[in-house]
Amino acid sequence: MGDWKGMIDVSGFINTYDNMIEFSFGFYNPSNGNQIDPYTSAGLAELIYVQQTLGYTINQIIGFGAQNVENARITGVELSFNSMGKIGEVEVVSLIGYTYMNPVSLNNEPKYSVYNSDSTTNMLKYRFKHLVRADIEAVYKKWSFGVSNRYNSFMRNIDKVFEEPIAQNTYILPGLKAYRSVYNKGNLVFDARVGYQINDTFKVSLIANNVFNSETSSRPGDIQAPRNFLVQLAMKF
């Protein structure tokens, strides 16, 4: 269209899994590999038995274990828009992408969802429903200016043990439940950059990551880096 070129791509996907394996954090009986639910009287009794009678330490009991969630299905849609063109003497390039996913377990047995932080949904753990990526760059003579952003929606389901006490007031990650109740709108981060093409070989850039110093976490306990600046010298040969 005139001096502009663009491409739109739309695709859908359906992935089905039989005997799907997920790693679940919790308590396990080392003698048989079964997961222990410390939030029930039977599970608490088994936990005490494993420690006091069988002699296993807490480090041998707690951790990630492979669990069979039976059947699962992940459906979704991906959209992308790429364009390039000129506004006067300024060349503009844009890349925009969006992904929607609906990752669900098809197993309705309560014993599989009881270890989830939200047992009211069959959404698989540690998944995002919405992902957005965008990048726009403008080039004027030897100068270039760019802005990018990334967004992921709130991770609704995680392992229950990260939010609930494992024994009275003992938490693995103290304060995580309150943190997630406040930061429940997803993560949105913006980056910016400015560059100067010195010659055909060298280009110097100033890059600002997390421009607005947003506090984000991709998964429990993994706080992402605050605002930071980088000076980059690139050599093309």
Model-derived regions: residue spans:
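C-terminal beta-signal and adjacent terminal beta-strands/loops
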Residues: 19, 28, 151-175, 182-237
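Extracellular loop and loop/strand-boundary signature of outer-membrane beta-barrel proteins
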Residues: 63-68, 117-123, 176-180, 191, ...
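Residue-level preference for beta-strand/loop junctions
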Residues: 4, 73, 90, 128, ...
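Short acidic-glycine motifs
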Residues: 3, 18-29, 63
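Solvent-exposed loop/turn elements at secondary-structure boundaries
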Residues: 3-5, 51
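A secondary-structure boundary/capping signal
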Residues: 9, 13, 207-208
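Gram-negative outer-membrane beta-barrel transporters
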Residues: 13-16, 30-161, 203
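Short glycine/proline-enriched coil/turn segments at helix->beta-strand junctions
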Residues: 6, 138-143, 198-200, 235
